[in-house]
C-alpha cells in the first residue's frame, strides 16, 4: 500500500502596518519604473531578457510584467501592480500606466490614514462613493467618435505620438469597419505597410495553451494549414487517426474547429504536438444552437472544408475510410486564448459570395434585434476581410517596440469607437476631481468616509501631474492652471508645452480606458489596504542531497526505483 505525504514549505508572516508597509515599498518601486513611460515625453525602459537582445519599450504593462524583487513582501506588492496593469490591459487595451499611478497613490494614502486610526472599511465605502461620482462625470464629458479623424487622433496618442502609425490604423479601420479584424505581422522592409487580405475571424481561442507555438506572444500560428470542421465532439482518437496520419505525411499543420475536443483525443494530440510529431491546434466552435451550426458552415465555405457530423450531410469521420476532400485549407491561422483569425481560405469564391448574399437577405427579413445583431456579426466576419499591418524596422528590437505601440493603439481605438472619447493627457480625471467637492460637503458621510473621498480626489489628479513632470515642468503649477480654466476641454499639451483645447488639438483618450484604469486601481488598492496579514514562502535551504543507499545483501542498488 502506498502513502502520499505532502509537505508544505515554511512561511513568513507579517501583520498590520508592517505587512502593508512592506508591500507599499514594492508597489512604489514598481510604479516608479512604470510611471516613467507616461505621456508624450515619457522615457523608454530597457528590460533584460532571458534570451536575445534587451527589450526597449514605453509600454506600461510590459514594464510591470518584467519586475520582480528579491524581497518576497516587496515582490507581493509588485505582483499586485502587475495584476492591476494586466486587468486594465485586458479590459481596455491601454491606460495601464495610469492605473499603476492611481493604485500607488490610493494605497499609499490609504495606509497612512489607517495608521492614524481611520476605519479601513468606512474609508473604503467613501472611496466607492467617490469612484461612482467620477465615473458619472467622465461619462458626461465623453463625446462620440464621428469620423476617421478622431480614430487617427486616438491611435496617434496611443502610439506615443507617431502620426504615421495613427494614420495607418485609421486607414485600416476605415477599410475593414469598426468590427473588422486588424492584425500585425513582422514586415520584410524598413517601412510599415498596410494590406487588406481575404480573411475571417472566429470568436473562440485555443482549447489548451499547450497548442501555443510562440511562448512570448502566447499565440498559435499555423502556416498553410489544413482545416477540419466538425459539428460533433471529438473524443475518440481512433476516428480521427486517418486525418492525423494524412496531415503528418503531408508535413502541413492542422487546425481543428469542432463542437469540442476532449479526453483521449485531446491528450493524444497535445502529446504528439509537444513531441514535435504533429503541428496542430484545436478551437471550440463559436456560437450556440442554430447560430453555431451556421457559423461552422461559414468557416467550412471559407476554407473549402465539409462540416463533419452535420445533420443530413452524410459526412462522417471513419477509422476505416478517409477522404482528403473533407479538409479545407487556409494560408495562415493565428489563434490566441480568445479568438482565431483565418487568412486566405481555400474555399470557392462564388460560394463565398452566395453565402454573403444569403446572410444579407436574412438580415433584411429578420425582426428580432438580437438575431439581427448576430447576423450582422456573421456578415462582418465573412465580408469585412482582415487588415494586416506589416511592421518594418531596421532591427528586431525596433520592430517589436513598434508592434507593442500598434497593439496599444488598436485597443484604444476600438475602445474609443465603442464608448466615446474624453480630453486626453489627464484633464478628464482632473475635471472629474472637482465633482467630488460637493460629495465632501455631504453631511451624511462619516469622517472616515470623507477621508476615502479625499484619497480618490488626490489620486485622480496624479496622472496629469506625472505627465507634466515627465515633460520637465512643475506638475503642481500646471495642474492648478488647468483647473482654474472654466473650459472643460482645455488642458496642457506636454509635447508642445502649451495650453490648448484638447479636442481641437487631437489630444484625446477613450472614455473606457479612463474608466477602467480608475475602477481597477481603486478595487485592487482597497483590497490591499484592508489586508491585515501577508504570508510568503521562506527561502529554501540549498542543503546537499543525501547519498544514495547501497544495495542490501543479495540485492542490487536502488537506482532503478522511481
Curated annotation (Swiss-Prot):
Write out the similarity annotation.
Answer: Belongs to the chaperonin (HSP60) family.
One GO CC term on file: cytoplasm
> Does the keyword Coiled coil belong to this entry?
no
Residues of the transit peptide: 1-8
A GO BP annotation: protein refolding
Query: What GO molecular functions are on record for this protein?
Result: ATP binding; ATP-dependent protein folding chaperone; unfolded protein binding
Q: Which UniProt keywords apply?
A: ATP-binding, Chaperone, Mitochondrion, Nucleotide-binding, Stress response, Transit peptide
Q: Which Pfam families is this protein grouped with?
A: Cpn60_TCP1
Do the record's keywords include Mitochondrion?
Answer: yes
Lineage, top-rank taxon, reads Eukaryota
**Name of protein:** Chaperonin HSP60, mitochondrial
Q: What HAMAP family does the record point to?
A: CH60
Give the originating organism: Trypanosoma brucei brucei
Q: Any idea where this protein resides?
A: Mitochondrion matrix
InterPro entries assigned: Chaperonin_Cpn60_CS, Cpn60/GroEL, Cpn60/GroEL/TCP-1, GroEL-like_apical_dom_sf, GROEL-like_equatorial_sf, TCP-1-like_intermed_sf
Q: What induces it?
A: By heat shock.
Q: What does this protein do?
A: Implicated in mitochondrial protein import and macromolecular assembly. May facilitate the correct folding of imported proteins. May also prevent misfolding and promote the refolding and proper assembly of unfolded polypeptides generated under stress conditions in the mitochondrial matrix.
